[in-house]
Design a protein with these regions (language model features):
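Glyoxalase I/VOC metalloenzyme domain signal
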Residues: 1-3, 7-29, 40-98, 113-126
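Short acidic/glycine-enriched loop/turn segments that link adjacent beta-strands
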Residues: 32-36, 104-108
Length: 126
């Protein structure tokens, strides 16, 4: 069982703010210089997401080309009737749509990138 998922960032403070607002998480840990920030679900302290500041080109920025995907990404869940509104909310927070809404056998999916280019899918299962 994993403890948390870590996302690499050039601006860890800004990216942590994006993910905290996007997923309803709160900051539970931060190194003084902001190099390492941990977010978690407020009620339980679970669903931990680490944001780690690095330098240079991020793997997700280098990995996406045409139909190739980054090797790992997050899946966020929303209700079937909520996907368009949720995409609009995420875009207003700084995300960008990488691949438009599409139907898969397990539900409707939209691929987005966070403000630093890390890919994630918004999934409406059902």
């Amino acid at each position: 069982m994993f403890d948390l998922v870590t996302v690499d960032a050039v601006d860890s403070v800004a990216l942590a703010a994006f993910w905290a607002t996007s997923c309803g998480l709160t900051e539970v840990e931060r190194e003084d210089d902001g190099r390492w920030i941990v977010l978690a679900e407020p009620a339980t302290g679970l669903r931990r997401l680490g944001i780690q500041r690095i330098g240079g080109l991020l793997p997700a920025q280098a990995a996406w080309a045409g139909d190739r995907k980054a090797r790992i990404h997050l899946d966020l869940r929303c209700g079937v009737g909520e996907i368009d509104a949720e995409v609009a909310r995420l875009v207003s927070l700084g995300a960008s749509v990488v691949r438009s809404s599409r139907d898969e056998t397990y539900g409707r999916i939209v691929t987005l990138a966070d403000p630093e280019g890390n890919l994630f899918d918004l999934c409406a299962y059902g």
